[in-house]
Amino acid sequence: MKRKECFWWVFAIIGVCFLSIRCSNVKEDYCCYVNPFIGNADNGHTFPGACVPFGMIQVSPESGNGSWRYCSGFNIEDDSIMGFSQNHLNGTGCPDLGDILILPFCGDIQNEKYKSRYEKEHQKAHPGYYSVVLSDFGVEVELTATQRTAMHRYTFRKAEPAHILVDLQSGIVSKNEQLRTHVIDAEMQLLDQYSIVGKNKVKMWVEREFFYVIKFDKPYIDIEELQPQEGEKAKRLLLSFDLKPGENVQVKVGLSTVSIEGAQKALEKENPDWNFEKVKAQSAEAWNNLLSRIDLSLIHISEPT
């Protein structure tokens, strides 16, 4: 009898120890210690947007171009945003990338500015996620990413016609006049009212070629092309959508340095659904797995860094 009672006591103690170990192994959110806005001011040349560790996508806002100030495409001291491109250099001190600039907007489709002031106090960024409100258009923008795909979610708040500018000519350059010449060759095809595919060959810091697939979760109801300037090879497309106030459009962009098929496979493998929250969570998990290698008990942290 005593032996049986002893067995149950040992079993209970082991169970308590097991539960305490499980509780102590609850994953810590290391992303909360990271502040992507560090280095965004003069001339830190960092970007606040979304990416995953060692990914080829860095989807982020652009606030200016054509000078050394904008090697990463963004300066937090600026008051307006021109759009959101799919890849960026970080802290390099040289301009390049900034491929496929996308801007959601509303109202008159022939908008001469194609930029908006933004609410800095509501701007958010943590590893794998970025959000901002374009105050002139009343559009909330959210960005996340996988290794080879970017995902955008645009929520249109105003009761005005909803549009998206897809600028395939844009890129981060040293001088504004290079915006017309840095694209050496370009091909683009509209597959249907949901998909755009193509390739660009560009030369800024180096000559390179990339292939893309752009997909929308809602069909565009109309499309226009902006008049190209002399020397430009790629197109700027204006897409219109039939939305009610509060509805959103999601955009996915797959990139490849090999082929359009490679960009499509990236979407199929890494981002097959229209589940923004799932991709956002997976991106945060990828960062947490990497950041967990750091022993925070040895560091006194008062602010995100």
Where are these regions (language model features)?
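Bacterial N-terminal signal peptides that target proteins for export
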Residues: K2-V10
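Bacterial N-terminal signal peptides
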Residues: V10-F18
